[in-house]
């Protein structure tokens, strides 16, 4: 059986992305046919900064239509508009290749959101770009590993704005799209307020969540969604035995327990998109850039998910 062709966007080159590419190539190429969306010259520079520890000649690369950022001992670990622009163009090219069916999926290495902002890129990050590019699809951010997956009803929005987003119709649409994408038989839904609202004592949002759960289960014809569960106990061991699939109303409520349990191995997946996309579930790690300290478990797991 032929290996799948996966486009790998380079992420912010001042972080750990290029180290992950170089140190993981042998393992990744055993899983898929990787196409690295980066100018080969930058990989050579990265390898020099890593004391020429890796082989670079056998990597299949595709040059990006963007100015080459500086990459040297003075730039690594620092926010750069030029690096932000380059990482965006690498990611956009990956999407174009996937749209044209030239690759089977894309793996995105971590970007720096401030670098994108400095480069005047009008998107908060990868998922925001995908939501704008594929407006007819409800793109869902799901993070985790095969032991625990968390779907985020809201992702990169201020916590104070989440309450207004919790509306029955929008949540039903989200829940059904999440179930369709994952094919999960049981999904536990975290509440929004302390004690999942305590029957209205602590806010009205959880009553809306309950109504959305009931409507979604009715549409599916079986009791798929459980909750709303008090979020402070939703991830207890006895709860995680029920199902690996969860939904969180906000970013940190779902991701704090996930990263406490499975930080090194978790991945980020864009569900319900017309293309297949997975990513590492960590940032650029500027503090350890080019020190040969990057853990590649999340990156390899993202490739495994795509392959």
Curated annotation (Swiss-Prot):
<keyword id="KW-0479">Metal-binding</keyword>
<dbReference type="GO" id="GO:0008615">
    <property type="term" value="P:pyridoxine biosynthetic process"/>
</dbReference>
<keyword id="KW-0521">NADP</keyword>
<comment type="subunit">
    <text>Homodimer.</text>
</comment>
<feature type="binding site">
    <location>
        <position position="156"/>
    </location>
    <ligand>
        <name>a divalent metal cation</name>
    </ligand>
</feature>
<dbReference type="InterPro" id="IPR037539">
    <property type="entry name" value="PdxA_epsilonprot"/>
</dbReference>
<comment type="pathway">
    <text>Cofactor biosynthesis; pyridoxine 5'-phosphate biosynthesis; pyridoxine 5'-phosphate from D-erythrose 4-phosphate: step 4/5.</text>
</comment>
<feature type="binding site">
    <location>
        <position position="268"/>
    </location>
    <ligand>
        <name>substrate</name>
    </ligand>
</feature>
<feature type="binding site">
    <location>
        <position position="126"/>
    </location>
    <ligand>
        <name>substrate</name>
    </ligand>
</feature>
<keyword id="KW-0520">NAD</keyword>
<dbReference type="GO" id="GO:0005737">
    <property type="term" value="C:cytoplasm"/>
</dbReference>
<feature type="binding site">
    <location>
        <position position="127"/>
    </location>
    <ligand>
        <name>substrate</name>
    </ligand>
</feature>
<dbReference type="GO" id="GO:0050570">
    <property type="term" value="F:4-hydroxythreonine-4-phosphate dehydrogenase activity"/>
</dbReference>
<keyword id="KW-0460">Magnesium</keyword>
<keyword id="KW-0963">Cytoplasm</keyword>
<dbReference type="Pfam" id="PF04166">
    <property type="entry name" value="PdxA"/>
</dbReference>
<feature type="binding site">
    <location>
        <position position="277"/>
    </location>
    <ligand>
        <name>substrate</name>
    </ligand>
</feature>
<dbReference type="GO" id="GO:0000287">
    <property type="term" value="F:magnesium ion binding"/>
</dbReference>
<comment type="function">
    <text>Catalyzes the NAD(P)-dependent oxidation of 4-(phosphooxy)-L-threonine (HTP) into 2-amino-3-oxo-4-(phosphooxy)butyric acid which spontaneously decarboxylates to form 3-amino-2-oxopropyl phosphate (AHAP).</text>
</comment>
<feature type="binding site">
    <location>
        <position position="251"/>
    </location>
    <ligand>
        <name>a divalent metal cation</name>
    </ligand>
</feature>
<feature type="binding site">
    <location>
        <position position="259"/>
    </location>
    <ligand>
        <name>substrate</name>
    </ligand>
</feature>
<feature type="binding site">
    <location>
        <position position="195"/>
    </location>
    <ligand>
        <name>a divalent metal cation</name>
    </ligand>
</feature>
<protein>
    <recommendedName>
        <fullName>4-hydroxythreonine-4-phosphate dehydrogenase</fullName>
        <ecNumber>1.1.1.262</ecNumber>
    </recommendedName>
</protein>
<dbReference type="GO" id="GO:0008270">
    <property type="term" value="F:zinc ion binding"/>
</dbReference>
<comment type="similarity">
    <text>Belongs to the PdxA family.</text>
</comment>
<dbReference type="GO" id="GO:0051287">
    <property type="term" value="F:NAD binding"/>
</dbReference>
<keyword id="KW-0862">Zinc</keyword>
<keyword id="KW-0560">Oxidoreductase</keyword>
<dbReference type="InterPro" id="IPR005255">
    <property type="entry name" value="PdxA_fam"/>
</dbReference>
<dbReference type="GO" id="GO:0050897">
    <property type="term" value="F:cobalt ion binding"/>
</dbReference>
<keyword id="KW-0170">Cobalt</keyword>
<dbReference type="GO" id="GO:0042823">
    <property type="term" value="P:pyridoxal phosphate biosynthetic process"/>
</dbReference>
<keyword id="KW-0664">Pyridoxine biosynthesis</keyword>
């Amino acid at each position: 059986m032929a290996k799948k062709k996966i486009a790998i966007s380079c992420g912010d080159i001042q972080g750990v992305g290029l180290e992950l590419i170089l140190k993981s190539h042998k393992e990744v190429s055993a899983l898929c046919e990787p196409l690295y969306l980066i100018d080969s010259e930058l990989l050579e520079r990265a390898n020099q900064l890593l004391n020429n520890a890796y082989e670079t000649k056998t990597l299949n690369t595709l040059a990006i239509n963007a100015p080459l950022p500086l990459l040297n001992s003075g730039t690594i670990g620092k926010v750069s508009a030029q690096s932000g622009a380059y990482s965006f163009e690498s990611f956009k090219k990956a999407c174009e290749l996937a749209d044209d069916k030239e690759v089977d999926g894309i793996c995105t290495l971590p970007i720096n959101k401030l670098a994108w902002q400095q480069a005047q890129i009008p998107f908060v990050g990868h998922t925001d770009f995908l939501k704008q590019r594929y407006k007819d699809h409800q793109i869902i951010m799901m993070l985790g590993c095969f032991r625990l997956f968390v779907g985020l009803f809201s992702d990169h929005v201020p916590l104070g704005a989440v309450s207004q987003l919790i509306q029955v119709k929008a949540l039903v649409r989200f829940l059904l799209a999440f179930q369709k994408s994952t094919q999960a038989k049981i999904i536990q839904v975290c509440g929004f307020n302390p004690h999942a609202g305590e029957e209205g004592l602590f806010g009205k949002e959880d009553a809306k969540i309950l109504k959305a759960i009931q409507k979604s289960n009715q549409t599916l014809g079986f009791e798929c969604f459980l909750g709303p569960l008090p979020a402070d106990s939703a991830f207890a061991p006895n709860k995680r035995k029920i199902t690996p699939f969860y939904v969180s109303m906000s970013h940190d409520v779902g991701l704090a327990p996930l990263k406490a349990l499975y930080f090194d191995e978790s991945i980020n997946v864009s569900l319900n998109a017309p293309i297949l996309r997975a990513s590492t579930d960590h940032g650029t790690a500027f503090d350890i850039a080019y020190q040969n300290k990057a853990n590649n478990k999340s990156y390899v797991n993202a490739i495994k998910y795509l392959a």
